[in-house]
Design a protein with these regions (language model features):
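Short, structured coil segments at secondary-structure junctions
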Residues: 68-71
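Ser/Thr/Gly-rich flexible loops in soluble cytosolic domains mediating phosphotransfer, phosphorylation
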Residues: 3, 73-99
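Conserved active-site segments centered on acidic
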Residues: 2-40
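CheY-like receiver
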Residues: 44-45, 92
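Short secondary-structure boundary segments
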Residues: 56-57
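Short acidic/histidine-rich motifs immediately flanking catalytic phosphotransfer sites
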Residues: 47-51
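Short acidic active-site motifs
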Residues: 39-44, 61
Length: 99
């Protein structure tokens, strides 16, 4: 599964990204994920990504991103993002990517 994880600049989402990679590895899943800012996501989504997950702090851009990006886009729930609940965020990614 190939996922874009977006926040304002890609910094805070990199923490969740590492947790998601660890979770995927421990469950034998193939996860290709990068953490980027929303501006970069608009530029790179066509590189084979299957879905985009938005950090809560940029959720105000959800509708705009859904119009610009032609793959599924969803907001990561605030609590899951804050505590780094990789399992719940992976479930969201699976749902978006029909996995």
């Amino acid at each position: 599964m190939k996922v874009l994880l977006c926040c304002a600049g890609g910094l805070s989402s990199s923490i969740l990204m590492r947790k998601m990679k660890t979770w995927a590895d421990s469950h034998g899943e193939d996860l290709d994920i990068i953490a980027v800012g929303t501006a970069e996501a608009v530029e790179v989504w066509q590189d084979g990504y299957e879905c985009v997950l938005l950090a809560p702090q940029v959720s105000y851009r959800l509708k705009e991103m859904q119009e610009e990006i032609k793959i599924p886009v969803a907001e990561v729930p605030s609590l899951d993002y804050a505590i780094g609940n990789a399992e719940n965020v992976m479930k969201l990614a699976h749902k978006l990517c029909d996995k």
